[in-house]
A protein has these predicted regions:
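Active-site helix of classical SDR
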Residues: 114, 150-151, 158
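Substrate-binding pocket helix/loop in short-chain dehydrogenase/reductase
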Residues: 90-91, 95-103, 129, 189
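Short, small/polar-rich loop/turn modules that mediate ligand/substrate recognition or access, typified
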Residues: 80, 166, 171, 219-221
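Conserved glycine-rich cofactor-binding loop
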Residues: 13-14
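Short C-terminal tail/terminal secondary-structure segment
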Residues: 139, 209, 220-234
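Alpha-helical segment proximal to the catalytic Tyr-Lys
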Residues: 119, 163-164, 217
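Active-site loop-to-helix junction immediately N-terminal to the catalytic Tyr of the SDR YXXXK motif
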Residues: 94, 140-148, 160, 189
Length: 234
């Protein structure tokens, strides 16, 4: 009998996180969803999974989610780290408190969850971690200062983690969305994309699905742009 596959999705109540949960469920994963609203619990109920209302800025909330997942299914095959929105302001006007909030929202959200699932994946001798990041980490924009700064740090963290745990068959990769339809659309932004359109949350979820699959088993430590050609770096 095939082993059940289990995925945890944080910040999974709406947007790219929710769409990733739906796609992984369709792929056959049992899903456990954390969200700060009640939407994650409602979505989990719809998908036959577990929902916890809480925040990925809380070690206790994340532990409740992991413990509930292990109690129900006894394993965690995939962790998808999504995030909310951090502070935005002119670069020198961002306060210390706002920088610390950005750190919590965009980097510590991953680190906290990873600390909890890594021993479980080590015991299983397998696991994959997928972080939904941003296309602006290597070509930063003043529009998203705290996101760009801390998710650039996430890229470094991902490479170190991937190198550390590759031999134990644990992978970590980042998905780098550009302009996605979960954001308000403007003609200026649409016109900046070579493909001439916004991406969809479903396209991000499809990328997450691939990275969680056996077909991506030789991919780790990577930053995969899903941006319609927006970023110019090669």
């Amino acid at each position: 009998m095939a082993t059940e596959k289990v995925a945890i999705i944080t910040a999974g109540g709406s947007g790219m996180g929710a769409e990733s949960a739906r796609r992984l469920s369709a792929d056959g994963f049992k899903v456990a969803i954390l969200s700060s609203s009640g939407k994650g619990e409602a979505l989990a109920a719809e998908l036959g999974g577990i929902g916890v209302t809480g925040t990925n800025q809380s070690n206790d909330d994340l532990k409740r989610l992991v413990d509930a997942t292990m109690a129900k299914w006894g394993r965690i095959d995939a962790l998808v780290n999504s995030a909310g929105h951090g502070p935005r302001a002119q670069i020198v006007e961002i306060t210390d408190e706002q920088w610390h909030t950005g750190l919590d929202v965009y980097l510590m959200n991953v680190i906290r969850a990873v600390r909890l699932v890594t021993p479980i994946m080590q015991a299983q001798k397998s696991g994959t971690i997928i972080n939904i990041s941003t296309a602006w980490i290597f070509e930063p924009s003043a529009m998203f200062p705290t996101s760009a700064v801390f998710r650039a740090g996430l890229a470094a963290y991902t490479k170190i983690y991937a190198d550390t745990y590759a031999a134990e068959n644990i992978r970590m990769n980042n998905v780098l969305p550009g302009w996605i339809d979960s954001l308000p659309a403007t003609e200026e932004r649409r016109g900046s994309v070579p493909m001439g359109r916004y991406g969809t949350s479903a396209e991000i979820a499809a990328t997450v699905s691939f990275l969680a699959s056996e077909g991506a088993g030789y991919i780790t430590g990577q930053n995969l742009k899903v941006d319609g050609g927006l970023m110019r770096g090669v």
